[in-house]
């Protein structure tokens, strides 16, 4: 997994979420204490980033898009590290060990515990990635009518990377027009 710039852990017992300036967190999203979110990330309304009792922090890199009803949950005592430029689409459920950069998680996919998703992967709508799995760079997992298939290709990443920054810019302009933005402790970068 490539190393994505991410905020430093200030304290495993910090009392509030830490958000680097220029991230956008909607008021009706849920963010646990101990979560760190880097610059540019957008949390849509009704998204949740939850640290269970006794679990480690969740550290989220730059420029991620976390859409409605997404649940990112850490139940492990180890930190959950999420890289940069990822797209988590509506209703996806993430309970993994780590995620690299430039990945797409389509609606209602599930990533189960201890899973490692490396860089530029695409997890299809409704797919379930089993516990303890490692998805190497450019892995594609898709659901057919009767089964789940896995292959590798750069095509999904090429498409995702070509529109991701434009998508982020649009969200940073439009979301504050229609939603209240959460006031959180801000670290200037």
UniProtKB/Swiss-Prot annotation:
Belongs to the dynactin subunits 5/6 family. Dynactin subunit 6 subfamily. One of its GO terms (cellular component) is cytoplasm. The gene is dynF. The keyword Ubl conjugation does not apply. It is found in: Cytoplasm, Cytoskeleton. This is Dynactin subunit 6. Keywords: Cytoplasm, Cytoskeleton. Part of the dynactin complex that activates the molecular motor dynein for ultra-processive transport along microtubules. GO terms for biological process: mitotic spindle organization. Subunit of dynactin, a multiprotein complex part of a tripartite complex with dynein and a adapter, such as BICDL1, BICD2 or HOOK3. The dynactin complex is built around ACTR1A/ACTB filament and consists of an actin-related filament composed of a shoulder domain, a pointed end and a barbed end. GO terms for molecular function: dynein complex binding.
